[in-house]
Amino acid sequence: MGNAQERPSETIDRERKRLVETLQADSGLLLDALLARGVLTGPEYEALDALPDAERRVRRLLLLVQGKGEAACQELLRCAQRTAGAPDPAWDWQHVGPGYRDRSYDPPCPGHWTPEAPGSGTTCPGLPRASDPDEAGGPEGSEAVQSGTPEEPEPELEAEASKEAEPEPEPEPELEPEAEAEPEPELEPEPDPEPEPDFEERDESEDS
């Protein structure tokens, strides 16, 4: 297996003979893959594809790619494994990035994104996080939560809730007592009738 400290260009130097022997049969497909991934330009692709000898084509391809730098060498090793149809441990460079244009293996510049360490705590996109009970628990956890909640509330609780919800009626203002009827004025007693003068005259006559 490729050494983690080994550069892609060093891997090509070490495995050059086996690469040339293995890639001769599918050199055209290898050229197509390198052109699609941006390693080769159009004129370079046309020049290599025009060579009639497959061995010479692969040898010139390896030299051309090594002259483009480590990013191109890295991409060549990836395309070589795919073109060969089976991964070869000798070509398995461990730090193969997602693409030639990304150049993720180069030393990062200050302020640029760097790959997260395995123990940094970041989760892969699409995987449920342990802190998410809905995703981590699955359907069983959701069923357990649903089974723990009562389906219908008790009637007593409903009655209490309805009482609390209804606003208390406001007390009616007390009516002021009607003013007491004024007492009717008392009638003055009629004076006694004066005695008739006949009796007085009789008394005077008796005295005389």
Swiss-Prot record:
The keyword Lipoprotein applies. One of its GO terms (biological process) is negative regulation of hypoxia-induced intrinsic apoptotic signaling pathway. Changing residue 31 to F: Did not reduce creatine kinase release or infarct size after myocardial ischemia/reperfusion. Causes loss of mitochondrial membrane potential and nuclear condensation. Failes to prevent the increase in Bax. Interacts with BAX. Phosphorylation at Thr-149 is required for its antiapoptotic effect by blocking death-inducing signaling complex death-inducing signaling complex (DISC) activity through the control of interaction with CASP8. Phosphorylation at Thr-149 results in translocation to mitochondria and this translocation enables the binding to CASP8. Dephosphorylated at Thr-149 by calcineurin; doesn't inhibit the association between FADD and CASP8 and the consequent apoptosis. Polyubiquitinated by MDM2; promoting proteasomal-dependent degradation in response to apoptotic stimuli. Keywords: Apoptosis, Calcium, Cytoplasm, Disease variant, Lipoprotein, Membrane, Metal-binding, Mitochondrion, mRNA processing, mRNA splicing, Myristate, Nucleus, Phosphoprotein, Sarcoplasmic reticulum, Ubl conjugation. CARD is critical for both extrinsic and intrinsic apoptotic pathways. CARD domain mediates a protective effect against myocardial ischemia/reperfusion, oxidative stress and TNF-induced necrosis. The C-terminal domain (amino acids 99 to 208) is involved in calcium binding and plays a protective role in calcium-mediated cell death. A lipid is attached at residue 2 (N-myristoyl glycine). It comes from Homo sapiens. SUPFAM superfamilies: DEATH domain (SSF47986). Residues 107-208 are annotated as: Disordered. The gene is NOL3. Residues 167-208 have a biased composition (Acidic residues). This is Nucleolar protein 3. GO terms for cellular component: cytoplasm; cytosol; membrane; mitochondrion; nucleolus; sarcoplasmic reticulum.
